């Protein structure tokens, strides 16, 4: 909070005169010598992976075996069906649904992913979850076992 009381030295006119004299000492509105800002350099972010839930490492620090395991997970995740959230046209589904990972309500048109146990989540939320743990966050059913068994029955 500032001081509300006027003092004889802090009136608007004296402040105006001080700022004009300051500008004159720098050469009429020019700034003192400054270097130009450095050129913009875009840094490409290095992906961060979680080989196990308790470990976080940059992609460049992973062993070949860990890179293969992550590539396999990404391949399995891409085989899970995805869609767009549509609460239903007839209004029969009146309860509010939310993604249990981010705790945000689903909005019409949100990209979602379906797990074999029929739970749905925001696409980005569940993909990130499955990179850490390949189980459903709601029922803890292993996603890879259900996914692999669906290929065996066909």
UniProtKB/Swiss-Prot annotation:
Polar residues biased stretches: 1-12
Result of altering residue 40 to A: Abolishes interaction with NEDD4
Phosphothreonine found at: 135
Subcellular location field: Early endosome; Recycling endosome; Cytoplasm; Nucleus
Keywords: Cytoplasm, Endosome, Lipoprotein, Metal-binding, Myristate, Nucleus, Palmitate, Phosphoprotein, Ubl conjugation, Ubl conjugation pathway, Zinc, Zinc-finger
Cellular component GO terms, alphabetical: early endosome; nucleus; recycling endosome; ubiquitin ligase complex
Lipidation (S-palmitoyl cysteine): 4
Subunit structure: Interacts (when phosphorylated) with 14-3-3. Interacts with the E3 ubiquitin-ligases NEDD4, ITCH, SMURF2 and WWP1. Also interacts with the E2 ubiquitin-conjugating enzymes UBE2D1 and UBE2N, but neither with CDC34, nor with UBE2L3. Interacts with ZNF350, EPS15 and STAMBP. After TNF stimulation, interacts with TAX1BP1, TNFAIP3 and RIPK1; these interactions are transient and they are lost after 1 hour of stimulation with TNF. Interacts with GGA1.
Protein name per its UniProtKB record: RING finger protein 11
Organism: Mus musculus (Mouse)
């Amino acid at each position: 909070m500032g001081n509300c009381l006027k003092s004889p030295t802090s009136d608007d006119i004296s402040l105006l005169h001080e700022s004009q004299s300051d500008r004159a000492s720098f050469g009429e509105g020019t700034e003192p010598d400054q270097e130009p800002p450095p050129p913009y350099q875009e840094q490409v972010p290095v992906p961060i992976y979680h080989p196990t839930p308790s470990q976080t490492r940059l992609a460049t620090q992973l062993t070949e075996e860990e890179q293969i395991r992550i590539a396999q997970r990404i391949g399995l995740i891409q085989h899970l069906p995805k869609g767009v959230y549509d609460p239903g046209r007839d209004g029969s589904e009146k309860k509010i649904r939310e993604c249990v990972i981010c705790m945000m309500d689903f909005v019409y048109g949100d990209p979602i992913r379906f797990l074999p146990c029929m739970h749905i989540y925001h696409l980005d939320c569940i993909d990130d979850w499955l990179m850490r743990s390949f189980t459903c966050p709601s029922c803890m059913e292993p996603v890879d076992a259900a996914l692999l068994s669906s290929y065996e029955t066909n």
